């Protein structure tokens, strides 16, 4: 069994720390990767972080994860509310999936309240800032280890 966890991020998350810091905070995607790698390493896992502003590239990463990852943490960002393609790709992945959002999407605009990804996710974290990624990695480690 592989011990790699894919952490997939959707559009505009490359601007984390710069774009709307009042909502998303001041930490960057590199900070997310560093923090998640440390959490995973404590449990004997590794992470592979990927970000794209393109839906098809995220779908391709999910397809790759079918062979290379034990679990997926995904923040699909705006694709959360629109992407049946990402949902379908996640249905083809057999391991655990945790959906993660930095902000509490349920306290924001009503169009953000619906998630296609939640139809496949084993758990959803929203509103914990980037700490939510760490919580998601901990849970994926547990699920991949059989817990």
From Swiss-Prot:
InterPro entries: DHquinase_II, DHquinase_II_CS, DHquinase_II_sf. PROSITE patterns: DEHYDROQUINASE_II. It holds the Pfam family DHquinase_II. Keywords: Amino-acid biosynthesis, Aromatic amino acid biosynthesis, Lyase. Its EC number is 4.2.1.10. It is an enzyme of class 4 (lyase). The active site is at residues 24, 101. The keyword Lyase applies. Pathway: Metabolic intermediate biosynthesis; chorismate biosynthesis; chorismate from D-erythrose 4-phosphate and phosphoenolpyruvate: step 3/7. Substrate binds at residues 75, 81, 88, 102-103, 112. GO terms for biological process: amino acid biosynthetic process; aromatic amino acid family biosynthetic process; chorismate biosynthetic process; quinate catabolic process. It catalyses: 3-dehydroquinate = 3-dehydroshikimate + H2O. One of its GO terms (molecular function) is 3-dehydroquinate dehydratase activity. The record marks 19 as: Transition state stabilizer. The keyword Cell inner membrane does not apply. Belongs to the type-II 3-dehydroquinase family. Catalyzes a trans-dehydration via an enolate intermediate. Homododecamer. PANTHER family: CATABOLIC 3-DEHYDROQUINASE. NCBIfam families: aroQ, PRK05395.1-2, PRK05395.1-3, PRK05395.1-4. This is 3-dehydroquinate dehydratase.
């Amino acid at each position: 069994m592989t011990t790699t966890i894919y952490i997939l991020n959707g559009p505009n998350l490359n601007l984390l720390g710069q774009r709307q810091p009042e909502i998303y905070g001041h930490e960057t995607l590199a900070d997310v990767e560093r923090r998640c790698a440390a959490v995973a390493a404590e449990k004997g896992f590794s992470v592979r972080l990927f970000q794209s502003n393109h839906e098809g590239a995220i779908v391709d990463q999910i397809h790759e994860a079918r062979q290379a990852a034990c679990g997926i943490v995904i923040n699909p960002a705006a694709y959360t509310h629109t992407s049946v393609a990402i949902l379908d790709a996640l249905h083809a992945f057999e391991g655990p999936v945790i959906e993660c959002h930095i902000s509490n999407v349920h306290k924001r605009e009503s169009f953000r309240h619906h998630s296609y990804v939640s139809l496949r996710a084993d758990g959803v974290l929203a509103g914990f800032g980037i700490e939510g990624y760490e919580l998601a990695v901990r849970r994926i480690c547990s699920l991949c280890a059989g817990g």
